Amino acid sequence: MSQFNFVILYVADVSKSQAFYADLLGRPALEASPGFAMFEAAPGVRLGLWKASDVKPAAGRPGGGELCIVVPEAEIAPTAAAWAAKGIEIALAPTRLDFGLTFVGLDPDGHRIRVFTPAG
């Protein structure tokens, strides 16, 4: 079976999003052009940023979705504070939900990035 190993987000400004994700991931893009940038999000997993106006076939307004990062519970509050200090909009402050402790930040295009610790 094929593995799920590449996520592409449609973005308004590739350069702005590239800078955001380089800072968030702590590494430079593997490749970059005016219309596309690609990162290694984790070993074997790539994150692409594609200029929305260049996408073929043209994409309509996408449905809701999230990128998720799992961290130890002790890192939730400090990570949320560090993101807020960098100017990342926090859509959900650290909160305990049914699935665990979580917070949500937004990238420059409003894509949700959920950081959480699974319950249990």
Predicted ranges, named:
Residues 1-5, 27-72, 77-106, 117-120:
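Vicinal oxygen chelate
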Residues 13, 107-109:
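Acidic active-site catalytic centers that drive phospho-/nucleotidyl reactions
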Residues 13-28:
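Amphipathic alpha-helical segments
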Residues 17-21, 83, 110:
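Conserved active-site tyrosine of GNAT-family acetyltransferases
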